[in-house]
């Protein structure tokens, strides 16, 4: 499901996954939907992706304002919905969690989720798979603005992905006729 796992949160124990930009649905995070009756619903927490630096915090240059946009699409490239997360980072307390398995102090990675936007999107009946695909990221710093939208760039993080659906009834198999 997660082609670009970031790792597990040290405090929340959530699994975090990078969302990359792309042009094709197969480039995103693929979510398979079992056979279902009526619409299904995908929900997840969308976070901005921050490169944490203690040095920038100490020098009062850590400010960032992130705006990440992702789309949830069907496999034929039909956009079901867009989702946006926007937040500001100033200090370590603005992080959602730290990701374990890194070379930083305490064994954490420099990349960390910041900001949380709960997302819930209805998926029409008949869809068997959807994708979460990054569209763009805008990063505002004290000294300028960066825009990221080239394919293959990580622009956001998702966690807590859940799928709600009403299972389709099992297919009935005809009972064999008895021989007399």
Residue ranges and their predicted role:
Residues 7-20, 80-125, 137-144:
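Extended, solvent-exposed segments with strong compositional bias
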Residues 55-68, 149-151:
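Short coil-to-beta strand junction motifs in C2/discoidin
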Residues 119-131, 136-180:
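C-terminal edge strands of extracellular/lumenal beta-sandwich accessory domains
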């Amino acid at each position: 499901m997660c082609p670009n796992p970031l790792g597990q949160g040290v405090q929340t124990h959530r699994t975090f996954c990078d969302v990359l930009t792309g042009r094709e649905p197969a480039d995103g995070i693929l979510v398979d939907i079992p056979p279902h009756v009526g619409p299904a619903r995908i929900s997840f927490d969308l976070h901005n992706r921050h490169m944490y630096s203690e040095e920038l915090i100490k020098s009062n240059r850590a400010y960032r304002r992130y705006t990440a946009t992702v789309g949830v699409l069907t496999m034929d490239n039909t956009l079901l919905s867009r989702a946006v997360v926007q937040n500001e980072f100033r200090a370590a307390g603005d992080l959602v969690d730290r990701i374990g398995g890194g070379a930083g102090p305490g064994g954490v990675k420099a990349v960390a989720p910041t900001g949380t936007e709960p997302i819930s999107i209805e998926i029409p009946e008949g869809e068997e798979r959807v994708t979460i695909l990054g569209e763009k990221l805008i990063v505002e710093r004290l000294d300028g603005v960066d825009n990221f939208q080239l394919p293959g760039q990580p622009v956001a993080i998702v966690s807590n992905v859940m799928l709600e659906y009403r299972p389709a009834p099992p297919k009935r198999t005809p009972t064999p006729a008895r021989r007399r």
